[in-house]
């Protein structure tokens, strides 16, 4: 972080010393002062409230003090402030998107000698789709705005009507790390540096690099749950908009969780490709053609027909398929591919301890997988009862995961699959492990000092939705490291 940038965390109250620039403000928190991105924070609704009110846990809307007309009038004013903030930030955001689409995307398309369509898609993602959706959303908000009595405005329904549209942010957020990598590569060449700077100046945009502008949609989708929570706080339970705001808050939290989950899943595909490349004698299509998540893994005894011969195999349950491998007799860290089962065509049946009527052998901690198309069955036995139960629960989770993916439309593109397999092959060639880290979504940008001329205000730092940790390597860590 630059020496002049202000360090802070979610929940801090920052005193704004200068807000002349729309993108970067100068502020003070505790004993430190410095620049911070304005888009990372939001203004407190009531500037007259002491900061302690925000640092303490805030009560819900139903617990607010509604006694007396003065208290209600104050609450109405604070609801008006929240509504004005929502509309103001949306209008600013629309201008920001328009500047990117007209100032950068349109100009880049004119230079076919510098940019291919694939490059433009990598750099800008689906930002033009986001721009179109946001314009419709702002129009709907303005239609619901009560100009004479703003506190009576009913904005909750707008969020509910457009909640499906916000899911397009998932594609943008997942692509953003690729955009940063491509921009970093291009800006090593002076002609691209000059071109991007010319685009910024012609559009009269502030002095921030393009990757800084492209970060805004990632930040924006995280703001909606916070704004709606603030709106709900100052909405009386008897207000006509109360139930809609409550439902909208829940819906936008789900959207944020969906985006985080999709991002987590896409971060896993490189690891899955690396795992596949470590398996000897792999046959058939790549794992990523149908799967993107390791759900469970472990050692099971496979009892085969017709002699009821038992085999120790390592099983890996992914969404839509179950892979089984054989350990090398001498090198136990090496696995050989032995086959796969299509989970879409299997029925899992619990088998009681005792003599199996099909194979006429005694089994314990067993379950059977029936194949609907071929009529084949696979008898598998765990060592302990609790291991068997974990497998049965994992099979149920796998079916639920597939159902959710179908409902939300989650899928891995052909380009993402190819890139993951290419990365895995490169790593295998070098023999060096590739670090898989979290993309730098919160990249800092340096800016020159700005004159202080704005009255002091206080802002509350945004708390972004927490990202669900991946359990891929947690599952893998229970096994020996698989490397050639």
From Swiss-Prot:
The keyword Cytoplasm is annotated on this UniProt entry: yes
Instruction: Cite the residue spans of the region called Disordered.
Output: 51-75
- Kindly state a single biological-process term from the GO annotations of this entry: filopodium assembly
Instruction: Fetch the InterPro entries from UniProt.
Output: DBL_dom_sf (IPR035899), DH_dom (IPR000219), GDS_CDC24_CS (IPR001331), PH-like_dom_sf (IPR011993), PH_domain (IPR001849), SH3-like_dom_sf (IPR036028), SH3_domain (IPR001452), SOS1_NGEF_PH (IPR055251)
Assembly with partners or alone: Interacts with RHOA and RAC1, and APC. Found in a complex consisting of ARHGEF4, APC and CTNNB1.
The SH3 domain is annotated at 1-46
Task: Identify the domain of life.
Answer: Eukaryota
Please list the residue ranges annotated as the DH domain: 78-262
**What's this protein's function?**
Acts as a guanine nucleotide exchange factor (GEF) for RHOA, RAC1 and CDC42 GTPases. Binding of APC may activate RAC1 GEF activity. The APC-ARHGEF4 complex seems to be involved in cell migration as well as in E-cadherin-mediated cell-cell adhesion. Required for MMP9 up-regulation via the JNK signaling pathway in colorectal tumor cells. Involved in tumor angiogenesis and may play a role in intestinal adenoma formation and tumor progression.
- Any one annotated GO CC term: cytoplasm
Q: Which SUPFAM superfamilies match?
A: DBL homology domain (DH-domain), PH domain-like, SH3-domain
Q: In which tissues has expression of this protein been reported?
A: Expressed in colon epithelial cells. Highly expressed in CNS, including hippocampus, olfactory bulb and cerebellum. Expression is aberrantly enhanced in most colorectal tumors.
Q: Which UniProt keywords apply?
A: Cytoplasm, Guanine-nucleotide releasing factor, SH3 domain
Locate the PH domain: which residues?
A: 293-400
* PROSITE patterns on file: DH_1, DH_2, PH_DOMAIN, SH3
How is this protein named in the record? Rho guanine nucleotide exchange factor 4
Which Gene Ontology MF annotations are present? guanyl-nucleotide exchange factor activity
| Tagged with keyword Cytoplasm | yes
Q: What is known of its domains?
A: In an autoinhibited form the SH3 domain binds intramolecularly to the DH domain, thus blocking the Rac-binding site.
Q: What CDD domains has UniProt attached to this entry?
A: PH_Collybistin_ASEF, RhoGEF
Per UniProt, subcellular location reads as: Cytoplasm
């Amino acid at each position: 972080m630059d020496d002049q940038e202000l360090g802070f965390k979610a929940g801090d109250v920052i005193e704004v010393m200068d807000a002349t620039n729309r993108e970067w403000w100068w502020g003070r928190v505790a004993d430190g002062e410095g620049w911070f991105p304005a888009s990372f924070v939001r203004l407190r609704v009531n500037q007259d409230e002491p900061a302690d009110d925000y640092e303490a846990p805030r009560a819900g809307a139903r617990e607010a003090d509604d006694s007396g007309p003065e208290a209600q009038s104050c609450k109405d004013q604070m609801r008006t402030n929240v509504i004005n903030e929502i509309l103001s930030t949306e209008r600013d955001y629309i201008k920001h998107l328009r500047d990117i689409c007209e100032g950068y995307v349109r100009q880049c398309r004119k230079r076919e000698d510098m940019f291919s369509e694939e490059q433009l898609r990598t750099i800008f993602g689906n930002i033009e789709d986001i721009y179109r959706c946001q314009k419709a959303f702002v129009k709907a908000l303005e239609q619901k705005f009560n100009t004479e009595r703003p506190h009576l405005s009913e904005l909750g329904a707008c969020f509910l009507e457009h909640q499906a549209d916000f899911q397009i942010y998932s594609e943008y957020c997942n692509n953003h790390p690729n955009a940063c990598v491509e921009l970093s590569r291009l800006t090593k060449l002076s002609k691209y540096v000059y071109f991007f700077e010319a685009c910024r100046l012609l559009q009269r945009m502030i002095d921030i690099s393009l990757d800084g502008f492209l970060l805004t949609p990632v930040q924006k989708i995280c703001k909606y749950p916070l704004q709606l929570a603030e709106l709900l706080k100052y909405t009386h339970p008897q207000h006509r908009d109360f139930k809609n705001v409550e439902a909208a808050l829940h819906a936008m939290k789900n959207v944020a969780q969906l985006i985080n989950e999709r991002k987590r899943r896409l971060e896993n595909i490189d690891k899955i490709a690396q795992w596949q490349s470590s398996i000897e004698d792999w046959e058939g299509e790549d794992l990523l053609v149908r799967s993107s998540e390791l759900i469970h893994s472990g050692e099971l005894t496979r009892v085969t027909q017709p002699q009821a011969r038992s085999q120790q195999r390592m099983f890996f349950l992914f969404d839509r398929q179950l892979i089984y491998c054989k350990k090398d007799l001498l090198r136990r860290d090496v696995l050989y591919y032995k086959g796969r089962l299509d989970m879409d065509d299997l029925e899992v049946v619990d088998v009681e301890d005792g003599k199996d009527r099909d194979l006429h052998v005694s089994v314990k901690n067993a379950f059977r997988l029936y194949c609907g198309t071929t009529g084949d069955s696979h008898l598998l036995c765990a060592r302990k009862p609790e291991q068997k139960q974990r497998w049965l629960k994992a099979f149920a989770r796998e079916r639920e995961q597939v159902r959710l993916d179908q409902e939300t439309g989650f899928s891995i593109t052909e380009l993402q699959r190819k890139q993951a397999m290419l990365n895995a092959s490169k790593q295998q060639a070098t023999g060096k492990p590739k670090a898989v880290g979290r993309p730098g979504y919160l990249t800092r940008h340096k800016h020159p000092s700005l004159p202080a001329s704005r009255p002091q205000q206080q802002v509350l730092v945004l708390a972004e939705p927490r990202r669900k940790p991946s359990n891929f390597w947690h599952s893998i860590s229970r096994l020996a490291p698989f490397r050639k």
